[in-house]
Amino acid sequence: MASSNLFSVGRDCQLVLIGPSGRVDLTHVTGFEARQLTQQIRVTRLDGTNLGTNLPRGWEGEFEIERGSSAAEDLINQTEQNYYAGGAMQFSTLYQYINETDGSVSTWQYSNVVVRLTEAGVWQGDSGVKQKLDFFASTRQRM
């Protein structure tokens, strides 16, 4: 469904995480953030001219979720168990779908994704359990 706004809002974004064993259903994603990582190169030539470039070094970000299942913990458990069994680290793939204001859909693929559970949640009375996952991806490309 196209956005009813002249600008993007949070509900215009959908995320699909494909783990080493298939789709990871993160039930209630309440926030998502991604940042490009770069290595800055700065050069000052002898004539005083300053030049620069930014070399791509991957992407990082985070998911905020309201726990609706054990999916996030299961992904982390699978990664840990594989590591302790002497297995190779396995990567995930993340897809971000954005409903654009013109009615089109932009699809971004984050490749070679590694995930960590930075907040497993606080369990209190009748409160929801908020969790946070951080990720690193080698690349992000438009599909």
PLM segments and residue spans:
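Short, acidic/charged, Gly/Pro-enriched secondary-structure junctions
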Residues: 77-108
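Short, structured patches in soluble enzyme cores that scaffold and shape functional sites
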Residues: 135-139
